[in-house]
């Protein structure tokens, strides 16, 4: 997807909050924006294609 491994790491090494869709660091346990504990890793591939 990204041209460089560094760029890909920057884009995909995050967790997404299931409540507010905020981006959080991989080491996060709760969302930085709303405090929700339900975080998922960002998808590496597009959905439905």
From Swiss-Prot:
- Species of the source: Archaeoglobus fulgidus (strain ATCC 49558 / DSM 4304 / JCM 9628 / NBRC 100126 / VC-16)
Ribosomal protein as a keyword of this entry, yes or no, is yes
Q: Which GO terms describe its biological process?
A: translation
Family membership noted in the UniProt record: Belongs to the eukaryotic ribosomal protein eL40 family.
Q: Which gene encodes it?
A: rpl40e
Q: Might you report a single GO cellular component term? A: ribonucleoprotein complex
Superkingdom of this protein's organism: Archaea
Name it: Large ribosomal subunit protein eL40
- InterPro entries associated with the record: Ribosomal_eL40_arc (IPR023657), Ribosomal_eL40_dom (IPR001975), Ribosomal_eL40_sf (IPR038587), Ribosomal_zn-bd (IPR011332)
One term of GO molecular function = structural constituent of ribosome
Q: Which UniProt keywords apply?
A: Ribonucleoprotein, Ribosomal protein
């Amino acid at each position: 997807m990204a041209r460089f491994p560094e760029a890909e790491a920057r884009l995909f090494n995050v967790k997404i909050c299931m409540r507010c869709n905020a981006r959080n660091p991989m080491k996060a346990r709760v969302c930085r924006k709303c405090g929700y504990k339900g975080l998922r890793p960002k998808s590496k591939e597009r959905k439905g294609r």
